[in-house]
Amino acid sequence: MKTKQYLAIDIGGTSVKLGIVDETGAVLVKAEESVSFDGYETPILTTVCKAAKAFVEAQGLSPAALVGVGVSATGQIDSRAGTVVGTCGNLPHYIGSPIKAELESLFGLPVTVANDANCMCLGEVWVGGAKGYTDVIGVTLGTGVGGGILTGGRLLEGARGLGGELGHYRLHALDGVPCTCGAAGCWERYAATTALVRAAQEKDPAWTNGRAIFAAAQAGNETVLALLDHWTDEIAQGLAGMVHIFNPQLILIGGGVSAQQKLLIDPIADKVKASVMPAFAEGLEIRAAQLHNDAGMVGAIYYFRQSHPER
């Protein structure tokens, strides 16, 4: 018997990932297209719709062969309306994008839209490192800090689906670094990979990205090791506060740097457990996310299936 198939779309700030995902969470085929190819002269949603239509046609599928469309999208997403209501970066023509309405019109199928970090968390819950867990915090470290929170088996979304913006938890509110959101002291200004790179470049302009920084750390560079120690302190302090609020079983850390077990994951785990009250540390697991680049697509389909159980 043929499995149900869904179109998954993961909209990022520089590219859109497209995939056909089945009812088991398997990604059957996928592709990626730039959304910034002309400096955003073409609105992101226009590029996404064109790429999605071409992708489905390239697979020899008609919309009738698909159950629905699940979208994971960067930015502040009103998941009830399926629209973009805010961003913390410079993405021209993106705020106000009616993602749900445009894709429903294009394919004649039901569409759900959720924040990308929420989708990462849901993907891990469905078929990844959080399978079988009911209380999970998922954090992605990259240009910013994204977050998804599962509590009692349900995604915490809030009134409009905007909940879980962990990166804008104001850890240094009184004397903090200005943030792209307009506030100051937001956690992502200290915990994002870009925060580590900024600090490293003040020491050596050659350390231009996470890869170069971790290579220097693995070679035993004491300056970089000290920077990493401070950076993981900042990450751990933010997570410790969240542990006291949400009492998770599991914290998953995603993003390109999450492959660094000894230099990143292990120190964060040790520091978080040392920073929380003992009862909160009991049984708490902290580890790297498993699904990597597919997490957003897989989570978008899980979100769709949760929203449309009849399909």
Name each model-derived stretch.
Residues 2-7, 19-21, 29-32, 36-41, ...:
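Glycine/GP-enriched mid-protein hinge/lid loop-to-helix segment characteristic of carbohydrate kinases
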Residues 37-62, 187-189, 195-252, 257-266, ...:
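Adenine-nucleotide phosphate-binding core of ATP-dependent small-molecule kinases
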Residues 3, 7-11, 15-73:
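Conserved phosphate-binding loops in N-terminal lobes of ATP-dependent enzymes
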Residues 41-49, 65-69, 75-135, 263-275:
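Glycine-rich phosphate-binding loop and adjoining helix at the ATP-binding site
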Residues 27, 77, 84, 155-156:
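Hydrophobic "anchor" residues
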Residues 14, 74-77, 142-144, 257:
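Short glycine-rich anion-binding loops that position phosphate/pyrophosphate groups of nucleotides
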Residues 59-63, 106-107, 205, 274-281:
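Short helix-capping segments at alpha-helix termini
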Residues 21, 112-125, 259-311:
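Glycine-rich phosphate-binding/hydrolytic loop that grips phosphoryl groups
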